[in-house]
């Protein structure tokens, strides 16, 4: 067929290829490796109870923040444990100036998925054989929990909605503090080091706040 015997891909693609029969079931060859991995990455290479690959890495989300800006606003990011506390912090940071925001909303679909999952959402369901897919974005409790929270921040003008993600201006915001924090994967420090080097020493990381 011209396809490689072994290929690297993102976890989300495993079901897409497995449903079509494009991946080889290697369950019998990998059962001994289960305890080597944490549950999340191990589950990510499975579909319908079968294993189709081995995890290579994991990018757990974390709360990255500009300590200099948070200190200026009188906010201790380490004490932000809930989304309500994050909302309160957003108001204090925006009070520093009209161009200061706790974070930006770039419209990233992956961010939406991650945050709704954090709230316990399961809006996408598949049948055991993968032949049927159910999408429930309007009634899922976790989706509503996140969208209500995020919409409140948007309605009150507490998020930067004008700066495109991964743009030069976006990284500039990381440097000058006008974009003061990120909920993102643990891989972001390398990006900050390369594209926002002038902000070195200002950024810290802590655990993600949750809905309650």
Question: What annotation goes with each model-predicted range?
Answer:
Residues 88-92, 132-163:
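Glycine-centered hinge/linker elements that transmit conformational signals in sensory
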Residues 77-83, 159-167:
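Short beta-strand-to-loop elements that line the ligand-binding cleft
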Residues 14-18, 185-200:
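A ligand-binding cleft/hinge motif common to bilobed small-molecule-binding domains
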Residues 1-37, 72-74, 81, 172-173, ...:
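Extracytoplasmic "Venus flytrap"/periplasmic binding protein-like
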Residues 9-13, 167, 184-189, 208:
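Beta->alpha turn/N-cap motifs
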Residues 10-61, 87, 115-117, 202:
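Hinge/lid segment of periplasmic solute-binding proteins
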């Amino acid at each position: 067929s011209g396809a490689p015997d072994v290929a690297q891909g993102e976890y989300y693609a495993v079901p897409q290829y497995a449903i079509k029969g494009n991946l080889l079931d290697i369950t019998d060859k990998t059962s001994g490796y289960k305890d080597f991995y944490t549950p999340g990455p191990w589950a990510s290479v499975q579909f319908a109870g079968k294993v189709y690959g081995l995890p290579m890495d994991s990018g757990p989300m974390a709360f990255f923040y500009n300590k200099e800006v948070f200190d200026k606003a009188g906010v201790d990011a380490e004490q932000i444990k809930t989304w309500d506390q994050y909302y309160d912090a957003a108001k204090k940071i925006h009070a520093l100036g009209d161009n200061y925001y706790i974070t930006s909303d770039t419209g990233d679909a992956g961010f939406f998925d991650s945050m709704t999952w954090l709230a316990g959402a399961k809006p996408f369901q598949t049948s055991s054989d993968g032949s049927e897919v159910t999408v429930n974005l309007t009634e899922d409790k976790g989706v509503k929990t996140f969208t209500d929270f995020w919409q409140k921040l948007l309605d009150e003008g507490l998020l930067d909605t004008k700066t495109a993600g991964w743009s030069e201006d976006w990284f500039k915001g990381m440097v000058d503090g006008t974009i003061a924090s990120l909920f993102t994967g643990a891989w972001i420090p390398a990006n900050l080091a390369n594209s926002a080097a002038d902000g070195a020493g200002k950024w810290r990381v802590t655990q993600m706040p949750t809905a309650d």
